[in-house]
Amino acid sequence: MNEEVEDGEVKPLELSSEDKAILVETLKNKLQALAEQHVDVLESLAPSVRKRVDVLMEIQSQHDELEVKFFEEKAALEAKYQKLYGPLYSKRSKIVSGVLEVQGETEEREEKGVPDFWLNAMKNNEILAEEIHESDEEALKYLKDIKWCRIDDPKGFKFEFFFYTNPFFKNQVLTKTYHMIDEDDEPILEKAIGTEIEWHPGYCLTQEVLTKESSESTKPITKTEECESFFNFFSPPQVPDDDAKIDENTAEELQNQMERDYDIASTLRDKIIPHAVSWFTREAVQDEDYGASWVDDEEEDDNNDEYSDEEA
């Protein structure tokens, strides 16, 4: 697959019109089916009920107009507070890395900062824990800080992963950028771009070398294969080149991969970065478990109520 590399970033292929149409065919079919169901429902109503539903739809339109303003004001408010968070994140980074000493520390200390802070914070989150493999952990111990910011042209957001000098790769900063488009007043992922990691020889974590013994007279056969790694996050799912045919199953698989990738990004942006110390101490894990338990209890109560009604 051909890719363009510029400024250390791998740019995804531009899709032909045919590929784009095939890739979104499944979604279009679903939307078409929903539209047909909408018409069927309206046509099945009695005239008097249909008039009432028409008024309800007008009310919904007014609600949707207000919702657009809500999202606009929400974006402005988020931008305001993101700037206010900045100094706090900076101080946190200095303490974690050992640049800033905390008052009241004893002079006798074996190591600076908070070792493995980001590694443990991410491992304590269920979604990210699935992405971090044992082979990744040593490299992630060199992770110094994670930042994110919104971008306007094109619209989206960007991650920066800052690393200490390490034996695994040359990059000091790994980035991941998400380009979004507005569709029906809701941001939709268009594409993601990740840094090309410059691995040191023999330290690549996204590939493994397999060796197969051959006859005594010849050398062993070796081949390189892709393997699971957290660092695949910086190589987002790509669509095959224009010559390849994308069937419905492939399109659905790509969609699932992109959704998974975006889930990881959302977790980093909305949970890990703003509440890193709570994930490090596992306080956030307890909060999530409590929330899930509360929902389960509510569902159980609802089920019990249903059984009681049936018995009555």
UniProtKB/Swiss-Prot annotation:
One of its GO terms (molecular function) is histone binding. It comes from the Eukaryota. Pfam families: NAP. One of its GO terms (cellular component) is nucleus. Residues 24-78 form a coiled coil. InterPro entries: NAP-like_sf, NAP_family. Residues 289-312 are annotated as: Disordered. The keyword Nucleus applies. Its main location: nucleus. GO terms for biological process: double-strand break repair via homologous recombination; nucleosome assembly. Keywords: Chaperone, Coiled coil, Cytoplasm, Nucleus. Gene3D superfamilies: 1.20.5.1500, Nucleosome assembly protein. A motif (Nuclear export signal) lies at residues 45-60. It is found in: Nucleus; Cytoplasm. The acidic domain is probably involved in the interaction with histones. May modulate chromatin structure by regulation of nucleosome assembly/disassembly. Belongs to the nucleosome assembly protein (NAP) family. This is Nucleosome assembly protein 1-like 4. It comes from Oryza sativa subsp. japonica (Rice).
